[in-house]
A protein has these predicted regions:
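Intrinsically disordered, low-complexity terminal/linker regions enriched in Pro/Ser/Gly
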Residues: 762-767
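Alpha-helical transmembrane segments of multi-pass membrane proteins
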Residues: 1-724, 728-734, 788-825, 830
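Short, cationic low-complexity segments
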Residues: 733-758
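Amphipathic alpha-helical repeat scaffolds of TPR domains
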Residues: 833-835
Length: 835
């Protein structure tokens, strides 16, 4: 393989172990990334700024590690021993993060409150957990690169190692998303990743020991990256690179002395467009697939697969072509590949004849999603993957740096661009200029990268050729920019249902925000629907209005003194509006993660939400509801939660045992909590998990049903702080008061004419449902089991079947839940019987 630093000689037979080591290292890194983002999101929140802090810190550590550690760790050190130390350090850091995070969370909550939880404090927490391991991760490839000679074949070998590392990322994404976290939990996933690190470290030490016993190469055994005709001195003193297809010094294609900076800039632009595209296309594909944990893992795996395969192709091309010219060609072709992906995602994939509502195994739909993702994004991913080894070989042609430092520089430039691209796209571009303009910007950036890559090769004798190339790049990029389509409004609204949606509804509003795309539709009969995550989230249809009003009115009418109220999730604002019109409420805080939702609630659902946006006693906080509750110093008399569907990635954090324990700790004496649980687009196991987890924290909880003509649809879970029963007479007396006229009218609009009608939606308590809940999995912060269970049923519509199996047979009237006069209790009994 060439001369290893520290006097160690490694020959060709050791390349396969090095590939395996980098594969294991990449697999572990992706598992860690998934686990750390999941766990840290529970601490600093899942809002877009918090997610940006996590991503920026993670990738920033990689960048610093690749750039700094190869300089600090001299080339005289045995690189395999250094690699082993890095892998062991990563394993130690991974285990440390898992075990010290609870203490960090406690300190964070103690330092921050909902008003002072600044980005700086969140960044500090992320840095404490992520910087040490990611700095070590960033140095692994540059350190191993010291095992090759600085020549064309050597840089090709580094490209293969990068390809192996990326292929490991594919395995890590699939293992984490489809097995380790679905079947086990974050702890098991961490231990598995640490085991891979230790295995890679031991393998490196074994190779170092074996190789050290044969310092002189055996006769007839070729050195890796050291064919005689390909020799290039590390110091850059060689006269030429004469490998087949290699660049020839003195020709018009040979880089100038200062051209390495152009190559670094090209690598940065390539990284920027790659991560910008990944962020944007993941958002758009999630609309079409349903934003489940499975969909995100699949999209990431396809993208990484393209990068890995492309890196292998680029490593081959680095030996057979002029690397700078090939790099320029890749960037030029990326203009077309980005345009293709934009067209495929907006104009092709949404209209493939797939009916997701047909009964089918989730595996079948995942196969279709895999094909669709590859069809759209694989071409671009292949080209981005090929760009790294080509940039490395092009920079290496300049000489002047040992392989570890040079690899670290190119890696750092690529990673720095990736940081800029991901953060700029997710936090600024998509929100300010939209998805279409963002993709147009990516095409323009790729065109600039193509010109930069070729610039060092231009000589006076080739000015005409250079001018023709530049003209072709600019003209083609300009044409492609004009051809980028907008995402169709119906796709934003209906997502995976686009091919089978009914005709008639008009999309009257669309918006792209930090967390996704949103829409409002109007049916011919005037019914309005608010869409998020590619499906209806709220509407003015009777069954939806009934559920949203139940969430709010049940909570405030049952609570002793509902002065301070927290509503998690604004949506159309109907639940928040229901609590806001209660005359007893003095302060209503609405925690909403997406700022774009405010405009929708204010402009389109004002009549239904009682003008909640703009109500002087309502405070709108744009934050992850869980994070706001954890950092708030106040206690609340009412907490009501109406999150996204539990199969939406991240929503399950609002259904965990730890979350309900947090809610219980924030409830004032006599306080009430309510939460929405859907029975449709879910599985029975998922519903059992939701209800069992709630009852685990609130043993006195109760289920209130929202049915459609007697059939199950969704339910409201309710619990009180303490064991006091619900006073039916008190609820009835409140509704009879003149100041409660708006509340009574609001309830009549959805079919509740009395307190008995409202409380008669009772469907059962913990004891009643004990047999049905037996064996249900508890959803915890460590396992987030719910998002995996629910993700298997997002296209299932078994609401009534689940409701029928859930209902207790012959259950007695809940005397411990309700209290009141005999007449009032008889009214509730009759209402329950009518249901």
């Amino acid at each position: 393989m060439g001369q290893v630093s520290g006097g160690l000689s490694v020959n060709d037979r050791f390349f396969a172990p090095l590939v395996a080591m980098l594969l294991a290292s990449g697999c572990a890194a992706l598992i860690y990334q998934v686990v750390w983002f999941q766990l840290l999101g529970l601490v600093i929140g899942a809002s877009a700024p918090s997610a940006g802090v996590l991503l920026g810190t993670f990738m920033g550590g990689l960048c610093v590690g690749g750039l700094v550690l190869p300089r600090w760790i001299g080339p005289e050190r045995n690189p395999l021993e250094v690699f082993a130390a890095l892998e062991a350090g990563i394993a130690a850091c991974g285990l440390a993060v898992l075990h010290v995070l609870p203490g960090i969370e406690a300190a964070y909550v103690g330092l921050a409150d909902a008003d002072r939880a600044s980005i700086a404090v969140r960044a500090l927490v992320a840095a404490l957990c992520l910087v040490p391991p990611t700095v070590l991760m960033g140095a692994t490839l540059p350190i191993v690169a010291r095992c090759v000679r600085a020549n064309v074949a050597g840089w090709s070998r580094v490209g293969w190692l990068y390809s192996a590392n990326t292929a490991g990322g594919v395995l890590g994404s699939v293992c984490a998303g489809f097995y380790l976290l679905r079947v086990h939990d974050a702890a098991v996933a961490t231990y598995a990743a640490a085991a891979l690190n230790i295995a890679a470290a031991l393998a490196a030490l074994a190779v170092a020991v074996v190789a050290s016993r044969s310092r002189a190469p055996e006769a007839g055994v070729p050195r890796i990256a050291e064919p005689p005709a390909d020799r290039l001195d590390v110091r850059g003193s060689a006269d030429a690179v004469t490998a087949a297809g290699g660049a020839r010094t003195g020709s018009a294609w040979s880089p100038s002395a200062h051209g390495v900076w152009a190559i670094h800039a090209t690598a940065a632009l390539s990284g920027m467009t790659a991560l910008a595209a990944e962020v944007l296309w993941t958002r758009h594909l999630a609309l079409l697939f349903g934003p489940t944990v499975y969909a995100f893992a699949l999209i990431l795996a396809v993208f990484l697969l393209g990068l890995g395969a492309g890196s292998g192709a680029g490593a081959l091309a680095a030996r057979r072509t002029r690397p700078a010219a090939a790099l320029a060609a890749c960037q030029w072709l990326l203009c077309a590949a980005i345009g293709w992906a934009a067209f495929a995602i907006a104009r092709s994939l949404p209209y493939w004849p797939l009916d997701v509502t047909l009964p089918s195994s989730p595996t079948v739909l995942l196969q279709a999603d895999l094909l669709r993702a590859a069809w759209a994004i694989l071409p671009a991913a292949l080209l981005w993957g090929a760009s790294f080894p080509l940039a490395l070989a092009a920079a290496g042609a300049h000489g002047g740096a040992e392989p570890g430092v040079l690899t670290g520089r190119v890696y750092a430039a690529n990673t720095l661009g990736a940081i800029v691209g991901s953060l700029l796209t997710s936090l600024v571009l998509v929100v300010v200029i939209g998805g279409r303009a963002t993709q147009q910007t990516m095409i323009a950036a790729s065109a600039c990268a193509a010109l930069l890559a070729l610039a060092p090769l231009v000589r006076r004798t080739r000015l005409v050729a250079a001018a023709l190339f530049a003209t072709a790049v600019v003209v083609s990029a300009a044409a492609l920019v004009r051809l980028v389509p907008e995402m169709p409004p119906e796709v934003v609204a209906y997502g995976r249902f686009t091919p089978t949606r009914g005709i008639g509804a008009d999309v009257i509003h669309t918006a792209e925000g930090w967390t996704g795309a949103f829409a409002v539709t109007r049916e011919p009969d005037g019914m309005l629907t608010y869409h998020g995550a590619g499906k209806a989230q709220a509407s003015t249809y009777p069954q939806d209005m009934r559920l949203q009003r139940m969430l709010g009115h049940l909570a405030t009418l049952v609570a002793d003194e509902p002065k301070r109220v927290l509503v998690i999730g604004l949506g159309a604002g109907v639940t928040a509006g229901a609590v806001s019109i209660d005359p007893a409420t003095e302060r209503v805080v609405v925690a909403e993660i997406e700022p774009r939702v405010r405009e929708i609630a204010a402009s389109y659902f004002r009549a239904q939400n009682h003008g909640v946006v703009g109500d002087p006693k309502v405070e709108l906080r744009f934050d992850d509801g869980r994070h706001y509750l954890a950092t708030a110093v106040d206690r609340f008399d009412v907490i009501t939660s109406d999150p996204l569907d539990p199969w939406v990635k991240g929503a399950a954090t609002l259904y965990t045992r730890e979350f309900w324990q947090l809610v219980r700790s924030r409830l004032a004496p006599g306080g009430v909590v309510t939460v929405f649980v859907q029975l449709y687009e879910s599985t029975e196991d998922a519903v059992r998990s939701e209800i069992a987890t709630f009852f685990d924290a609130f043993p006195n909880g109760a289920v209130f049903a929202n049915t459609v003509r007697g059939a199950g649809y969704d339910v409201v879970l309710l619990a009180r702080a303490g064991d006091a029963p619900i006073d039916v007479d008190l609820v009835a007396a409140r509704l009879a008061r003149p100041e409660y006229a708006r509340v009574a009218a609001s309830l009549r609009e959805v079919g509740f004419r009395s307190a008995a009608d409202l409380l008669g939606t009772y469907a059962g308590g913990r004891d009643d449902l004990a047999h049905w809940l037996d064996g249900a999995e508890i959803n915890t912060d460590r396992n987030l089991r719910l998002q995996y269970l629910a993700g298997e049923g997002l296209n299932r519509y078994d609401a009534n079947e689940i409701f029928e199996r859930m209902l207790p047979r012959g259950a007695a009237f809940p005397d411990r839940l309700f209290t009141g006069s005999p007449a009032a209790l008889d009214g509730v009994r009759r209402a329950i019987a009518r249901r």
